Regions:
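Intrinsically disordered, low-complexity repeat segments enriched in small/polar residues
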Residues: 7-9, 26-27, 187
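Low-complexity, Ser/Thr/Pro-rich intrinsically disordered linker/stalk segments at domain junctions
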Residues: 122-228
Length: 228
């Protein structure tokens, strides 16, 4: 029994109302003289494609926002000394669009005092495709077709391709089962897999990693689940 896609269209049915990407601001505070060195809030949860913006609230010193493994580094040219690196200066901002993962970061100017975490789950939805399926007929030269809806789980872990030298790892499992690798160091941003059986709970996670390194990676994203 063959299958033919009708119109080539893939219809995406989001389980939740779609929302525009948003921006979350984190303040980078304080200096070594007056104290108060911190990122506030130190831990945030955002969605794939959201922007995190850091604002330097201090009047004197630079700050940076740097992923623990150097996967990304938001700094600047202000305030460098022989003892300290430069960063983004008082009153200025830096920002980044985020992919799925649990990303720990710190300030390179104040590495002991300033740390933060950004948690981003993968985005999951149900998609469907209309296909024309050939039905067997007793007379070989008579072809009959019927329309069938095929359902898919659609997984999105990033809104953009990663920077050069980076890639994404993606794993899935049925609830309670073993994790299975579905992508390794990919530069792609999404996938879909066909739903063969209904009423199954699928769980997925992803992370950002330096290609060629097993350890230079963000943490896995918070668990995301969907019922097929």
């Amino acid at each position: 029994m063959g299958a033919i896609t009708i119109g080539g269209a893939f219809l995406l049915l989001s389980l939740a109302a779609s929302a525009q990407a948003s921006t979350t601001e984190v303040t980078a505070n304080g200096n070594a003289f007056t104290g108060g060195l911190s990122f506030m809030p130190a831990s945030i949860n955002v969605r794939v494609g959201d922007t995190v913006r850091w604002r330097n609230t201090d009047f004197l010193v630079p700050h940076t926002a740097t992923e623990d493994h150097g996967l990304w580094d938001l700094g600047g040219s202000y305030g460098g000394t022989p003892a300290n690196p430069p960063g983004f200066g008082p009153g200025t901002t830096v920002q980044r669009v985020f992919e799925a993962g649990t990303q720990a970061y710190y300030c390179r100017v104040h590495p002991r005092q300033m740390h933060g975490t950004i948690r981003v789950p993968v985005s999951l939805s149900i998609g469907r495709k209309r296909v024309r399926v050939r039905v067997r007929h007793r007379r070989p030269h008579h072809r009959r077709y019927r329309i069938k809806i095929r359902r898919y789980v659609v997984v999105v872990w990033s809104s953009t391709r990663p920077a050069a030298g980076l890639g994404f790892d993606v794993e899935r499992r049925q609830a309670g089962g073993r994790w299975r690798v579905v992508r390794t160091a990919t530069t792609g941003t999404r996938l879909r897999f066909r739903i063969v059986r209904r009423n199954r709970v699928w769980q997925l996670r992803a992370r950002l990693r330096r290609s060629g390194s097993a350890t230079a990676a963000s943490g896995w994203s918070p668990l995301a689940s969907i019922r097929s």
